[in-house]
């Protein structure tokens, strides 16, 4: 079914609306998105929770969390809506059941070195969109070949992570055009560089997210981006890959990964603004999560 693209929206809003699948009673559980979150350790249980709940609130039907055994009980207790696997290894075997994957939130940096290539190779074999964030970016910095040349990979570095990754891949400090340069050097993966202005590039094109955000910088906001982004990536690639859909013609200028990154950036920025209007300095990521429904309806009125 062709997505509804509402009139009166900005060009960026229309771009994202064109890949969002319409809701209808004919769909079965799981068809709107099954997302996997690979992350969670003894110290960090909140990060995978926020990523997972962002995916659910954005519209995913099912979300699996694959975490260290020490994190599983806490994450299970946070929400009964999440399917929690108390082992990272389960992520590899469950990939055929998923539509998109997030690697990194709260993962920690002591994962066995040989396991990461196995995970990313299987993701490539399945053709799954993969969002790499937080500790996942640490492993990509150590081994850029994990994502090199994979067009369905989306990296979401903050300023510090971008600096480290750029130096590791290009061997010099970041320059003014660091985002498209990094994307090209990694074989045209998509990079969503988070900052005062979110910059998105696949090395061919560049988008700037102009949506106003929040001055509050509480922990967990990046996890909200990565979780919602995984679902947007599934939707966008599905729209792009479906023959005959109008969205495929409309989105020819920008690749599906870039459109997905734009959607997630806009959504979380609007959530931050709405939450800050209510909570000011007390704003937490949980407050932003509570604004997903309102922000989505305001930005992407497709239903």
Swiss-Prot record:
Q: Which NCBIfam families match?
A: yjeF_cterm (TIGR00196)
**PANTHER family referenced in this protein's UniProt entry, alphabetically:** ATP-DEPENDENT (S)-NAD(P)H-HYDRATE DEHYDRATASE, ATP-DEPENDENT (S)-NAD(P)H-HYDRATE DEHYDRATASE FAMILY MEMBER
The similarity annotation says: Belongs to the NnrD/CARKD family.
Q: Which residues form the YjeF C-terminal domain?
A: 12-299
Q: Which residues does the record give as (6S)-NADPHX binding sites?
A: 106, 158-164, 223
Protein known as: ATP-dependent (S)-NAD(P)H-hydrate dehydratase
Q: Which residues bind ATP?
A: 194-198, 213-222
Class in the EC hierarchy, top level? lyase
Query: By its UniProt entry, which SUPFAM superfamilies does this protein fall under?
Result: Ribokinase-like (SSF53613)
One Pfam family matching this protein: Carb_kinase
Which metal ions or organic cofactors does this protein require, according to UniProt? Mg(2+)
Alphabetical keyword list: ATP-binding, Lyase, NAD, NADP, Nucleotide-binding, Phosphoprotein
Query: Under which EC number(s) is this enzyme classified?
Result: 4.2.1.93
């Amino acid at each position: 079914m062709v997505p509804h693209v509402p009139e009166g929206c900005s060009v960026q809003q229309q771009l994202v609306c064109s890949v969002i699948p319409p809701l209808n009673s004919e769909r079965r559980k799981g068809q709107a998105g099954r997302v996997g979150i690979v992350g969670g350790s003894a110290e960090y249980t909140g990060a995978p929770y926020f990523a997972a709940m962002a995916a659910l609130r954005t519209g995913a039907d099912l979300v699996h969390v694959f975490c260290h055994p020490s994190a599983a009980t806490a994450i299970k207790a946070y929400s009964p809506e999440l399917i929690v696997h108390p082992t990272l290894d389960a992520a590899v075997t469950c990939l055929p059941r998923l539509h998109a994957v997030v690697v990194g939130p709260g993962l920690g940096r002591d994962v066995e070195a040989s396991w990461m290539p196995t995970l990313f190779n299987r993701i490539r074999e399945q053709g799954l969109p993969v969002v790499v964030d937080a500790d996942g970016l640490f492993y990509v910095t150590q081994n850029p070949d994990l994502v090199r040349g994979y067009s369905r990979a989306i990296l979401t570095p903050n300023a510090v992570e971008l600096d480290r990754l750029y130096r590791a891949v290009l061997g010099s400090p970041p320059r003014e055009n660091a985002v498209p340069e990094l994307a090209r050097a990694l074989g045209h993966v998509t990079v969503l560089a988070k900052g005062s202005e979110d910059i998105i590039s696949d090395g061919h094109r560049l988008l700037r997210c102009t949506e106003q955000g929040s001055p509050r910088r509480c922990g967990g906001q990046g996890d909200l981006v990565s979780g919602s982004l995984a679902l947007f990536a599934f939707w966008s690639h599905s729209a792009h890959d479906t023959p005959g859909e109008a969205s495929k013609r409309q989105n020819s200028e920008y690749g599906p990964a870039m459109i997905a990154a734009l959607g997630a950036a806009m959504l979380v920025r609007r959530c931050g603004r709405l939450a800050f209007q209510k909570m000011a300095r007390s704003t937490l990521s949980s407050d932003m999560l509570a604004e997903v429904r309102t922000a989505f309806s305001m930005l992407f009125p497709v239903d």
